[in-house]
């Protein structure tokens, strides 16, 4: 049975106040300097605030007891450390949790906590609201891009999950949230600056303290940005592959028409630190009668030759109006056996959260791209109603 929880919080930052939740140390330092603090003092205060927000999960400046009382009052006057509004929170019968977070009028993104992944559990975060890639098997691909998420908005997804799991401070033992995967809405490499800044914040040892080796970024194949991702983040790399030849991949992943399979694999081989301790994960959705033959399994083995890698075989998760069916389980197992015999780990991903449309490829919000002038009107109307 699906359980829907009402965990709504006040919408957006308070009028006239800027939200500090999720900001990086450099961004916090800039805000402190804008208050008039000297650079050295601003840096110290930024690090203190970062620790309170991202290590302890604090939502009240009054609790930041190592900051002078008068400065705390000044901070409370100009800033706030609340969470963004949770428009919807659903819990699947298998323990998967999905949040629809509202960052502003018409700006909503989804994130999903998946138990029993990695050391304990993984949070699948979104990097954009909507997507430009139009992958034909993906529900997000049916939603036009609304906008990139900021670094702080990406980090806020992690904070919201930690709130729900009661995992503050970051130093507690036996955490249930140990891994972060950028496999939600959007193409992370089309928002690399914000993704890289978010990873810096998430992996900060004095903040959230989730190691970079426990953070995976998945791309549909923005080849020129792949080496840069490794250089800037040190994160693990995942490739949304799904086909072994250009004709089929052009259909399933239209980005392949711009960066074909050869170009993609050249970029993968240039990923910094690639080796047995840092393998690429290839994601391969199993589509009945489309890409699931044993010949294609053998072609996949040839394609991966010389690339330290593993393959996640993903049973297709249907969504309303989807044009595909999932491969038969026997077919998936036979496909995996070909890969296993060739020496590649090829786990079959257990579908999680299907009953709440939280499984791989099922994420989609109802946000649509609205003109900036219209958003301003909506914001003004909302603020007028509150006053």
Curated annotation (Swiss-Prot):
Catalysed reaction, written as an equation: adenosine(2503) in 23S rRNA + 2 reduced [2Fe-2S]-[ferredoxin] + 2 S-adenosyl-L-methionine = 2-methyladenosine(2503) in 23S rRNA + 5'-deoxyadenosine + L-methionine + 2 oxidized [2Fe-2S]-[ferredoxin] + S-adenosyl-L-homocysteine; adenosine(37) in tRNA + 2 reduced [2Fe-2S]-[ferredoxin] + 2 S-adenosyl-L-methionine = 2-methyladenosine(37) in tRNA + 5'-deoxyadenosine + L-methionine + 2 oxidized [2Fe-2S]-[ferredoxin] + S-adenosyl-L-homocysteine
Keyword annotations: 4Fe-4S, Cytoplasm, Disulfide bond, Iron, Iron-sulfur, Metal-binding, Methyltransferase, rRNA processing, S-adenosyl-L-methionine, Transferase, tRNA processing
Top enzyme class: transferase
Annotated S-S bridges: 124-360
Any one Gene Ontology cellular component term annotated for this protein: cytoplasm
Active site: residue positions: 110 (proton acceptor), 360 (s-methylcysteine intermediate)
GO terms assigned for molecular function: 4 iron, 4 sulfur cluster binding; metal ion binding; rRNA (adenine(2503)-C2-)-methyltransferase activity; rRNA binding; tRNA (adenine(37)-C2)-methyltransferase activity; tRNA binding
Cofactor(s) needed for function: [4Fe-4S] cluster
UniProt entry tagged with the keyword S-adenosyl-L-methionine: yes
Further comment: Reaction proceeds by a ping-pong mechanism involving intermediate methylation of a conserved cysteine residue.
Protein name as annotated: Dual-specificity RNA methyltransferase RlmN
Native source species: Hyphomonas neptunium (strain ATCC 15444)
Gene that encodes the chain: rlmN
């Amino acid at each position: 049975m699906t359980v829907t929880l009402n965990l709504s919080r006040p919408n957006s930052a308070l009028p006239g106040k800027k939200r500090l939740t999720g900001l990086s140390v450099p961004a916090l330092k800039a805000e402190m300097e804008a208050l008039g603090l000297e650079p050295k003092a601003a840096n110290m205060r930024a690090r203190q605030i970062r620790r309170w927000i991202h290590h302890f999960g604090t939502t009240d400046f009054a609790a930041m007891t190592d900051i002078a009382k008068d400065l705390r009052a000044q901070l409370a006057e100009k800033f706030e450390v609340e969470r963004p509004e949770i428009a919807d929170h659903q819990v699947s019968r298998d323990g998967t949790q999905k949040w629809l977070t509202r960052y502003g009028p018409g700006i909503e993104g989804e994130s999903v906590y998946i138990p029993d992944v990695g050391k304990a559990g993984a949070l699948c975060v979104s990097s954009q609201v909507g997507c430009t890639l139009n992958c034909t098997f993906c529900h997000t691909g049916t939603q036009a891009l609304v906008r990139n998420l900021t670094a702080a908005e990406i980090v806020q997804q992690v904070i919201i999950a930690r709130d729900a799991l009661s995992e503050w401070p970051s130093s507690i033992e036996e955490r249930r949230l140990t891994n972060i995967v950028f496999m939600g809405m959007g193409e992370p490499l089309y928002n690399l600056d914000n993704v890289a800044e978010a990873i810096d914040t998430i992996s900060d040892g004095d903040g959230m303290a989730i190691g970079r080796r426990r953070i995976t970024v998945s791309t549909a194949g923005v080849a020129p940005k792949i080496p840069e991702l490794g250089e800037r983040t040190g994160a693990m790399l995942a490739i949304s592959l799904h086909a072994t030849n250009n004709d089929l991949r052009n259909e399933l992943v239209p980005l392949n028409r711009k960066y074909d399979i050869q170009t993609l694999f050249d970029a993968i081989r240039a990923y910094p630190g690639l080796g047995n301790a840092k393998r690429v994960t290839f994601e391969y959705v199993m589509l009945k009668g489309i890409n699931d033959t044993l010949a294609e399994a053998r072609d996949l083995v040839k394609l991966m030759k010389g690339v330290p890698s593993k393959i996640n075989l993903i049973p297709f998760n249907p969504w309303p109006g989807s044009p595909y069916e999932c491969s038969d389980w026997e077919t998936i197992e036979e496909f995996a056996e070909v890969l296993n015999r060739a020496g590649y780990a090829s786990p079959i991903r257990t579908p999680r959260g299907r009953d709440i449309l939280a499984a791989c490829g099922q994420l989609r919000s109802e946000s649509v791209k609205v003109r900036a002038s219209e958003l301003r009107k909506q914001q003004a109307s909302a603020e007028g109603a509150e006053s």
